[in-house]
Amino acid sequence: MNKSLIFLLSFAYSCYSTKTENNFDINDVENKACQYGCGFENVRRTSFRKTYDILYTCSECSTLFDLCIKYRTCQDGCVPEMPVLPYDQAKDVSARIRPPMNPCLDLVTACNYESMDSYEILRSENPFLYI
C-alpha cells in the first residue's frame, strides 16, 4: 500500500514538475497560429507539438488539451473545428450541467490539480464566453 502511494505521489510530482519546467502560454500559441489565418492549421499544430508532448505525459491533461485546442481557434472569418461539441449540443449540455462547458477552463483546473469550484467566479451561462 505504501509503495503504491509513493509511486502515485512521485508520478503526480513528475507530471507537475515537467509542466512547470516548460511553462507555456496557450494564448501565445493561439495568437501565433491565428495571425496567419485558419489555412495554417498545420503550422499551428506544429507550433504546439512540444507543449502537447509535455501535457501528454499527464494523461488527464492530454484529452482536455485536445478539446481546448479544438475550441481556441481563429474567431474572424473562420469556422472552428468542432467535431466534439457543436453549439446546440453545448448549449443543451450547459443547461443540464453547471456551466460553462469550457475545456480550456477544465484544462487549467485539472493540470493545476485544482477544483472547478476554485474558478466559480469565472463561470457563465455562455459556454463559449472564454473561447
From Swiss-Prot:
GO terms for biological process: spermatid development. The keyword Signal applies. It comes from the Eukaryota. Keywords: Developmental protein, Differentiation, Signal, Spermatogenesis. Residues 1-17 form the signal peptide. Required for spermiogenesis. This is Spermatocyte protein spe-27.
